[in-house]
Regions:
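Extracytoplasmic electrostatic interaction patches
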Residues: 74, 78-175
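Short, flexible coil/linker elements and helix-boundary hinge sites characteristic
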Residues: 8, 34, 43, 56-57, ...
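Short, Lys/Arg-rich N-terminal segment immediately upstream of the first membrane anchor
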Residues: 1-7
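N-terminal export/targeting and maturation segments
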Residues: 22-105
Length: 175
């Protein structure tokens, strides 16, 4: 009788252990999803981008929303999404965000010159740092200055594109 009781106890312990594993993963998945939704609702843009780009988990959702991300193999190799491309009034490339900032790259034209623009934005999508450059006739990358009015115009376009991205991703994920 004692042997059967030990086997029964062992079977119960093993069953509880096997039940705990999927419950843990289900809880963990729900927790991550709720953290992302909370970041969306609090308008924490950097945190939202970080969660979306931290792994390949949301790559198909980002593609479904109409944005461009690297192929799944590259995402697995990099351990996450290194950039998201937004096609709009200007074609933006968002790099994986840092702690309190996100890098946005795009091209524009000013004075009939193609200019590469590099913005580092904070959570309110204001410019922390900016850099403008072009390739000269001698194939040398040179720094370019643009007017304050032009910078403000470009920033408004970038802010609109990023806000539209956030709204569309929220609708795609929780819609």
């Amino acid at each position: 009788m004692s042997d059967k009781l030990k086997q029964f106890k062992l079977l119960i312990v093993l069953s509880l252990f096997l039940l705990a594993i999927p419950l843990y993963f289900t809880y963990n998945h729900f927790q991550q999803s709720s953290v992302l939704k909370e970041a969306f609702e609090k308008n924490e843009r950097i945190e939202v981008l970080h969660h979306l780009m931290a792994s390949g988990k949301y790559a198909s959702d980002i593609r479904k929303a109409g944005y461009v991300v690297p192929p799944d193999g590259a995402i697995r190799l990099d351990g996450g999404i290194d950039s998201i491309e937004i096609k709009g009034d200007i074609d933006l490339k968002i790099s994986n965000p840092g702690r309190n900032e996100v890098t946005v790259l795009f091209e524009t034209t000013a004075k009939e010159e193609k200019i590469d623009v590099y913005y580092i934005l904070d959570n309110q999508l204001t410019i922390k740092r900016s850099y403008y450059s072009n390739i000269s006739n001698q194939k040398i990358k040179e720094s370019v200055d643009i007017s304050q009015a032009e910078e403000e115009r470009l920033l408004k376009i970038v802010q609109k594109e990023l806000e539209d991205f956030m709204e569309k991703m929220y609708q795609t994920l929780y819609g």
